Amino acid sequence: METTKPSFQDVLEFVRLFRRKNKLQREIQDVEKKIRDNQKRVLLLDNLSDYIKPGMSVEAIQGIIASMKSDYEDRVDDYIIKNAELSKERRDISKKLKVMGEIKNGEAKSE
């Protein structure tokens, strides 16, 4: 079987397409994040509407908002902690994979 060596133009086209694909992937993720954020805002307003009743005092409404804010801040803190734990696990796995790769490369070189 004969394999043809890719021309310089083919390589450039491959790189261009690969970069475009990555850019599109980043844009898609960005738009998905914006969609999620706006859906959360709509849900927040719905929740707030459920709590606020006609004739409530400004202080009562401010109390509800303060309580909701506190709940959301607690969730953010929990997510920050969870993210740190996941990042630590990912780093540990990366180190193990690197060591395994070095051992594998060392065995291949000695053969």
UniProtKB/Swiss-Prot annotation:
This is Pole-localizer protein TmaR. The lineage of its organism: Bacteria, Pseudomonadati, Pseudomonadota, Gammaproteobacteria, Enterobacterales. Residues 14-41 form a coiled coil. Pfam families: DUF496. NCBIfam families: PRK05423.1, PTS_reg_TmaR. Its main location: cytoplasm. It comes from the Bacteria. Keywords: Coiled coil, Cytoplasm. Pole-localizer protein involved in the regulation of several cellular processes. GO terms for cellular component: cytosol. Belongs to the pole-localizer TmaR family.
